[in-house]
C-alpha cells in the first residue's frame, strides 16, 4: 500500500511511483465493480469540484461529471468562454479563487505549465484532463483495459503508431516505463518524443525490466506487439495545408488488417478517441472530399473488429478518473 495520495495533484505520471499508479488502477477496478453492481459509493458527499475546460471534450467531461456525481460531489463546468483566466484575471488569482470555493480542480487545455501553475497556487488537488504535453488520466484507462483483457500488463509490448511527439505517446511511454511494459514508438523519424523525455523513460524502464524502442519500420515496430495503439492525425481548426502534409507523412502508419496480423496473435487495438475510421464525422467527410480517404489512422475493419477494445477503454476513463479524485480528496 503506497503512502496516502490525499491532497496530491495529478498532473503527470512522472510524479507518481509504480506502486502509486498500481494503487490507482486497483482502486479503479474496485469502483468499476461498485458501479456494475449498482452499489452506492457517495464517499465524497459534501465536496465540490470545478472542471476548467479550455479545450472541449466528450469523454473527459462526461467521465469527470459522472464520476463526481457518483461520489456524491457537486460538479461545476466552465467552458472555454466562461472563465476569465488569463484574460481579465491572472492564472494565479484564478487558481486561488477557485481553490477557496472548490475542493478540487480539473484542467483541460494547452501548455503543461498552466496546469502545473494551477497546482502550485490553488491549494487544493488539481487534475490534468489533457495538456499539449501529457494526458495522464487516459493512461490509467488504457492500462486498466489491458489488465482486464490479458489479466496482467507487466512484460507486454505496446506499440504506438503515428505521430509519437504528441501528449498521448508521451504519456504512454511514461506509464509503460513505470509499469514494466515494453513501449515502441512507430512513426516518422522526425515525429518521435523529445530526447530528454526518452532518456528519462529509458532510465525508469531499465529499473522496471522493460524497454523503450523508437522505429520508423512498421513491420519491426509491430512484430511483437500485444497492443497496437494510435491517435488521430488531424484536428478541427488546423489549416488544410497542414492536413495534406500530415496525411502524406502518417499514411504509412495507418492501423489496418496487415498491421494487426503482423502483431502477436491475440493482440488488441486501442485508441483514445475520437477516431476518423469512416465518413460519419464532419472532419471525416471533409478529408474524403479533399483527399479521397474514407479512413485515416485506423481502418473501419480494425476499429469494429473483436480485437478493438476502444469502448471498454472509453468506459474506463470514468472509473479511473473516479479513482484519482477519490484518492486525492478522501
Regions found by a protein language model. Name each.
Residues 2, 286-330:
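C-terminal helix-to-coil terminal segments
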Residues 71, 101, 121-122, 179, ...:
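Short, structured coil segments at secondary-structure junctions
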Residues 96, 103-175, 271:
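Anion-binding alpha/beta catalytic cores of soluble intermediary-metabolism enzymes, centered on
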Residues 203-299:
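Rossmann-like adenosine-cofactor binding region
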Residues 1-62, 66:
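Positively charged, low-complexity intrinsically disordered leader regions
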Residues 53-66, 148-231, 236-238:
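Glycine-rich phosphate/diphosphate-binding loop of Rossmann-like nucleotide-binding domains
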